[in-house]
């Protein structure tokens, strides 16, 4: 593969947390650029500019020989966001935003 995107739903003890969050492998500059582009597209979709892509040590990203990210689509622990994530139209728009982020990454090299 040329890129790896692992898609998840998030859950957190603070039920007020919401919004998509993108993670990348610490120290991987290309994955950071990839994550930043997806996070920007997701932030535009949900109307939130507070989230920045976050680094960490993630097994799936460590194993990938190509730029890789983890996309947490939202927090199931937030009842309002859970309701949105259960809506097929919302999920389609969310996935289209991820695709926009991929295009931003691919065409901004």
Task: Annotate the PLM regions.
Residues 1-109:
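Active-site-proximal helix/loop segments of hydrolytic enzymes
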């Amino acid at each position: 593969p040329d890129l790896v995107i692992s898609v998840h739903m998030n859950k957190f003890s603070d039920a007020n947390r919401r919004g998509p969050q993108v993670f990348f492998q610490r120290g991987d500059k290309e994955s950071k650029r990839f994550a930043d582009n997806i996070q920007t597209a997701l932030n535009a979709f949900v109307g939130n500019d507070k989230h920045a892509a976050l680094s960490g040590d993630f097994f799936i990203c460590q194993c990938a020989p190509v730029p890789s990210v983890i996309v947490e689509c939202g927090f199931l622990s937030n009842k309002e966001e859970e309701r949105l994530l259960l809506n097929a139209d919302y999920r389609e728009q969310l996935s289209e935003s991820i695709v926009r982020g991929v295009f931003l990454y691919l065409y901004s090299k």
